[in-house]
């Protein structure tokens, strides 16, 4: 199993593709051609690299967390600190690239979907930086549980549109953003937030996020003298996971683990564990694993984490799962919240609830792999946006709040 890194789409095995209305074909063709040209253009590559150095804050650090690791069977645990990026997550890596591309193709307006609000904040940030008009679609449920990020987007000058259809979460936000793009395709570029959707989005977003793994591979080698035994990341659509996995795909001795949102439990109706519980189908212009009923209709997902509350997953993850190259496991809401508190109290780092799914998974993984193992975790975002959820969950805010 070698040379997996060279597979660029539009298909990853049987997954991926481009199943869209005729009205979007020309826009996707334009985007695809522009990206193929720009990604090998030395001037574009250098401009993006310099932006990341002076604006994003790359390379991001790695941090070893020994007190947290004591709870993982003593395995050595290293975090890739995407939470330290400007705007607080990995999302800025993708957005700066797509915003630069938007300028190059001469469009003045960008739109995006967002769940946790991190992609929306990053997109609004890039729009402010480059002087672009910006509209963000966000499920009404998510605008309520991520109100801080809604305020950030509006402060940055973006229009935030709450989506009231369907389950009022990420899936529905993508639907409305797609409709906007169909209507305004001449002036508008859709800055897609994850490695899902129609080609070229899975490949392009992966290309823009793979810097995470490229940096981390060098950093872990420098710190430990060898590659990690396992690389772990949370998986919703899956961009942070592909971003850190990609550099290791052809290292057969490095195991890859994606931790999905199990919600109340993967065996309950309230889950977002797409690969664990789903089967192949069509959603948002691509074939991938989906949560669906016996009639093939996409069903609502559930997660305490807005960013993982999605009934699909990127096609490259579906392919890696079927190949056996990566393993995908569910983590419940309660397990994720417990890991969030544990990292906060043992290391002084408050992670995003999304990232806490990877932390929870790694706690179990460490016990399986033993004390000699090195586990690299993508800490994809910081937890500031989740303080209201965590405050309610742990009863931190009232007079009788938990003190121990």
From Swiss-Prot:
EC number: 4.2.1.20
Name of the molecule in the record: Tryptophan synthase beta chain
Cofactor(s) needed for function: pyridoxal 5'-phosphate
Pathway as given in its UniProt record: Amino-acid biosynthesis; L-tryptophan biosynthesis; L-tryptophan from chorismate: step 5/5
Catalytic activity reported: (1S,2R)-1-C-(indol-3-yl)glycerol 3-phosphate + L-serine = D-glyceraldehyde 3-phosphate + L-tryptophan + H2O
N6-(pyridoxal phosphate)lysine modified-residue sites: 91
Disulfide bridges in this chain: none
Class in the EC hierarchy, top level: lyase
Superkingdom of origin: Bacteria
Gene: trpB
Gene3D superfamilies in the record: 3.40.50.1100
Gene Ontology MF terms in the entry: tryptophan synthase activity
Description of how the protein assembles with itself and partners: Tetramer of two alpha and two beta chains.
Claim: Kinase is one of the keywords in the record: no
Function: The beta subunit is responsible for the synthesis of L-tryptophan from indole and L-serine.
PANTHER family xref list: TRYPTOPHAN SYNTHASE, TRYPTOPHAN SYNTHASE-RELATED
Cited PROSITE patterns: TRP_SYNTHASE_BETA
Keywords: Amino-acid biosynthesis, Aromatic amino acid biosynthesis, Lyase, Pyridoxal phosphate, Tryptophan biosynthesis
UniProt similarity note: Belongs to the TrpB family.
Keyword rRNA processing: no
A GO cellular-component term linked to this record: cytoplasm
InterPro entries: Trp_synth_b_CS, Trp_synth_beta, Trp_synth_beta/beta-like, TrpB-like_PALP, TrpB-like_PALP_sf
Native source organism of the sequence: Clavibacter sepedonicus (Clavibacter michiganensis subsp. sepedonicus)
């Amino acid at each position: 199993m070698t040379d997996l890194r060279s597979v660029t789409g539009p298909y990853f095995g049987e997954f991926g593709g481009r199943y869209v209305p005729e009205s979007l074909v020309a826009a996707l063709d334009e985007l695809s051609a522009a990206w193929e040209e720009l990604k090998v253009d030395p001037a574009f590559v250098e401009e993006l690299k310099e932006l990341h150095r002076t604006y994003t804050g790359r390379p991001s650090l790695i941090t070893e967390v020994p007190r947290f690791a004591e709870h993982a069977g003593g395995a050595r645990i290293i975090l890739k600190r995407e939470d330290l990026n400007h705007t607080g997550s990995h999302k800025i890596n993708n957005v700066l690239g797509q915003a630069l591309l938007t300028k190059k193709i001469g469009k003045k307006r960008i739109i995006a979907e967002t769940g946790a609000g991190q992609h929306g904040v990053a997109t609004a940030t890039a729009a402010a930086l480059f002087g672009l008009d910006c509209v963000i679609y966000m499920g009404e449920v998510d605008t309520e549980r991520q109100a801080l990020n809604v305020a950030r987007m509006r402060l940055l000058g973006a229009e935030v549109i709450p989506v009231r259809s369907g389950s009022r979460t990420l899936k529905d936000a993508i639907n409305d953003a797609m409709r906007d793009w169909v209507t305004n395709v001449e002036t508008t570029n859709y800055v897609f937030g994850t490695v899902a959707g129609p080609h070229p989005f899975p490949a392009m977003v992966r290309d823009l996020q793979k810097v995470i793994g490229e940096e981390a591979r060098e950093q872990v080698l420098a710190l430990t003298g060898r590659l990690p035994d396992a690389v772990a990341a949370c998986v919703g659509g899956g961009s942070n996971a592909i971003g850190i996995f990609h550099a290791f795909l052809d290292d057969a001795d490095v195991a890859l683990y994606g931790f999905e949102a199990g919600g109340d439990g993967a065996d309950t109706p309230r889950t977002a564990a797409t690969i664990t519980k789903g089967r192949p189908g069509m959603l948002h212009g691509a074939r991938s694993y989906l949560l669906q009923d016996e009639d093939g209709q996409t069903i609502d997902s559930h997660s305490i984490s807005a960013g993982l509350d999605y009934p699909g997953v990127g096609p490259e993850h579906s392919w890696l799962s079927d190949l056996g190259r990566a393993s995908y496991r569910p983590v419940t809401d309660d397990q994720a919240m417990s890991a969030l508190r544990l990292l906060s109290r043992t290391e002084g780092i408050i992670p995003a609830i999304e990232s806490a799914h990877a932390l929870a998974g790694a706690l179990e993984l460490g016990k399986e792999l033993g004390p000699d193992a090195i586990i690299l975790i993508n800490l994809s975002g910081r937890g500031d946006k989740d303080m209201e959820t965590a405050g309610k969950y742990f009863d931190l805010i009232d007079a009788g709040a938990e003190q121990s």
